[in-house]
Amino acid sequence: IFLTFISLFIGLQAYAAEESVYERVMRTGELRCGYVPWPGFVEIDPNTGKKEGVTVDYIEAIGKELDLKIIWAMETGWGNYAEGLRSNKYDVMCAGLWKSGQRAKISLLSRTLFYDNMFGFARADDIRFKNMPLENLNAPDFTITVIDGDITQAVRRADFPNAKEHSISADISAAQGVMSVVTKKSDIVFESIASINKYNDNADIKLVPINNEKPIRQFPVCIGMKPGEHDLKAMLDASIEALQVSGDFKKILSKYPELALSMERQK
């Protein structure tokens, strides 16, 4: 009897260990989100902790569509969010990710939610970049701030390999990237227009887009999951498509015109 009990106990442990994220979500009725504070996308009320922004609205709409409770479980970083997925600290990276091959290697990516632009920003008083062709940035005369392990680092290395790199840790606030340009530790930072507008609102030293105010890259924005969680991805993809077809996502985007997001890829 004792051996039978031990065998049963070990079997139950193995079963519990093998539970997928999808199975846990179905069992609990909850979807646990990792997130990164991102102006316009995920903003946190300092007094109440309430989350607001376009991707917050998107995720809450997905939760409603699937009859799942959304739990904003843990703050993470752009360069290390995949570690939290692998260690089951949260089920989905919900802040929104600029989709790339590099990120597809470390996380399972959903279908596209919408499209966002990445710009290069310099100090407003740095006249070197006024009307400068973008290809001229690929030179050792310029330093670009990137986040370790992030898509910004991949873009710098792919498009501007001859420029110098000023890297900041994935564990600290992305605002440090902005400040690196303000304090002249670097010349350029890659960011979304919303993040820089938020900074410029109260800043003495303003940042402005280079490249004649044209984006460096346009990215599809998605959410990320633990590699191998294809059942979870299928469920989330189906709900994303349903909300796109119903027009619900378009209504959400219309609330945030200042973010200049689009449902379709711009040519």
Please state what every model-predicted region is.
Residues 62, 85-86, 137, 178-182, ...:
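Hydrophobic residues within well-ordered alpha-helices
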Residues 54, 58, 140, 192, ...:
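Short amphipathic alpha-helical coupling segments at ligand-binding clamshell hinges
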Residues 79, 96-105, 154-158, 180-217:
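A ligand-binding cleft/hinge motif common to bilobed small-molecule-binding domains
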Residues 114-122, 193, 200-241, 258-267:
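Periplasmic-binding protein-like
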Residues 124-143:
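Flexible hinge/capping segments at coil-to-helix
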Residues 17-97, 105, 167-170, 255-256:
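Extracytoplasmic small-molecule ligand-binding "clamshell" domains
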Residues 1-11:
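Bacterial N-terminal signal peptides
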Residues 16-19, 149-166, 204-209, 240-267:
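Ligand-binding clefts/hinges and TM-proximal coupling segments of bilobed small-molecule sensing domains
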